[in-house]
UniProtKB/Swiss-Prot annotation:
Compartments reported by the entry: Membrane
Entry-linked InterPro entries: UPF0154
Membrane topology according to the record: Single-pass membrane protein
Pfam families: UPF0154 (PF03672)
Name of protein: UPF0154 protein BH2350
Organism: Halalkalibacterium halodurans (strain ATCC BAA-125 / DSM 18197 / FERM 7344 / JCM 9153 / C-125)
Keyword set includes Transmembrane: yes
Keyword tags: Membrane, Transmembrane, Transmembrane helix
Transmembrane domains' residue ranges: 3-23
Keyword Hydrolase: no
Family in the record: Belongs to the UPF0154 family.
């Protein structure tokens, strides 16, 4: 009888972890679809919209600064 309770508890934990993983994965995918990460092309367009001339050096500096900020 004791082993049956332990089996059900273990099975419940495994099923809970699996369901949690798929829910978290779906949530993250929908978040990334709504808010894609910024790439160099997006930065170039953003700078052009602000009236600045986007040089490759400036874009590289901004990308490094954003990556440094995200790693904090």
């Amino acid at each position: 009888m004791n082993w049956m309770i332990l089996l059900w508890i273990t099975l419940g934990i495994v099923i809970g972890i699996a369901i949690g993983f798929f829910i978290a994965r779906k949530t993250m995918m929908s978040y990334l679809k709504k808010n894609p990460p910024i790439n160099e092309q997006m930065l170039r367009v953003m700078l052009m919209q602000m009236g600045q001339n986007p040089s490759q050096k400036k874009i590289n500096q901004m990308m490094k600064a954003m990556q440094k900020q995200q790693s904090k």
